[in-house]
Amino acid sequence: MGCCYSSENEDSDQDQEERKLLLDPSNTPTKALNGAEPSYHSLPSARTDEQALLSSILAKTASNIIDVSAADSQGMEQHEYMDRARQYSTRLAVLSSSLTHWKKLPPLPSLTSQPHQVLASEPIPFSDLQQVSRIAAYAYSALSQIRVDAKEELVVQFGIP
C-alpha cells in the first residue's frame, strides 16, 4: 500500500522526459515503434457529448409534440356536423339501454319523505349516544367470547366390515 519511489534520488532529465510523455499524451511522438504512423482516435470532448445528448432529447421531444396550429383548420360542413351528432347520439342510446339498472336506482337512498323535518329536529342527546356505544361494546365482547367445545367426534364410524 504505497509507492516504490524514493524522493532521495534526484530525477534525471530522461526520467522527467518520460514522466512528461506519460502524463501528457498530446506530446507523444508521431512515429510508432515499428516505423508506421500511429492512428489515434480522437475522443469526443465533453462539450460534444453534451451537445449530442441535448440534440437527441430535442429530436425525441419534437417527435412527441403535436403542433395544433399547423393542423388544417378546415371547419366541418353543417351536414357533417349533423351526421356526427346523430352517430354519437345513437351510440349513447345503445350504451344507455344496456345500463337500465342504473336508471332505476334513486341517486340517494330515501329514508324519509321529508328530510327537512329530520334535519330541523333536535339532535340526539349525548347520553343516548353513550348508551348505544356501551351496548355495542357489550355485544362485541359477548360475540368475541363465544367458544365451540367439541364434545364428541364429528365423524362417526359405522360398524361396516
Curated annotation (Swiss-Prot):
Cysteines joined through disulfide linkages: none
GO process annotations (BP): cellular response to amino acid stimulus; cellular response to nutrient levels; cholesterol homeostasis; endosomal transport; endosome organization; lysosome localization; lysosome organization; positive regulation of MAPK cascade
Region (Interaction with LAMTOR2 and LAMTOR3): 121-161
Sites of the Glycyl lysine isopeptide (Lys-Gly) (interchain with G-Cter in ubiquitin) crosslink: K20, K31, K60, K103, K104
Modification after translation, per record: N-terminal myristoylation and palmitoylation mediates its recruitment to lysosome membranes, thereby promoting localization of the Ragulator complex to lysosomes. N-myristoylation by NMT1 is required for palmitoylation at Cys-3 and Cys-4. May be palmitoylated by ZDHHC3.
Lipid attachment residues per UniProt (N-myristoyl glycine): G2
Membrane topology type: Lipid-anchor
Residues with a covalently attached lipid (S-palmitoyl cysteine): C3, C4
Residue span of region Disordered: 1-43
GO MF, any single term: protein-membrane adaptor activity
Keyword Phosphoprotein tagged: yes
Location(s), subcellular: Lysosome membrane; Late endosome membrane
Family annotation (SMART domains): LAMTOR (SM01262)
Coiled-coil ranges per UniProt: none
Residues modified as Phosphothreonine: T28
Keyword Flavoprotein part of the UniProt annotation: no
Function: Key component of the Ragulator complex, a multiprotein complex involved in amino acid sensing and activation of mTORC1, a signaling complex promoting cell growth in response to growth factors, energy levels, and amino acids. Activated by amino acids through a mechanism involving the lysosomal V-ATPase, the Ragulator plays a dual role for the small GTPases Rag (RagA/RRAGA, RagB/RRAGB, RagC/RRAGC and/or RagD/RRAGD): it (1) acts as a guanine nucleotide exchange factor (GEF), activating the small GTPases Rag and (2) mediates recruitment of Rag GTPases to the lysosome membrane.
Subunit structure of this chain's protein: Part of the Ragulator complex composed of LAMTOR1, LAMTOR2, LAMTOR3, LAMTOR4 and LAMTOR5. LAMTOR4 and LAMTOR5 form a heterodimer that interacts, through LAMTOR1, with a LAMTOR2, LAMTOR3 heterodimer. Interacts with LAMTOR2 and LAMTOR3; the interaction is direct. The Ragulator complex interacts with both the mTORC1 complex and heterodimers constituted of the Rag GTPases RagA/RRAGA, RagB/RRAGB, RagC/RRAGC and RagD/RRAGD; regulated by amino acid availability. The Ragulator complex interacts with SLC38A9; the probable amino acid sensor.
Name of the protein in question: Ragulator complex protein LAMTOR1
Organism per entry: Rattus norvegicus (Rat)
Phylogenetic placement of the source organism: Eukaryota, Metazoa, Chordata, Craniata, Vertebrata
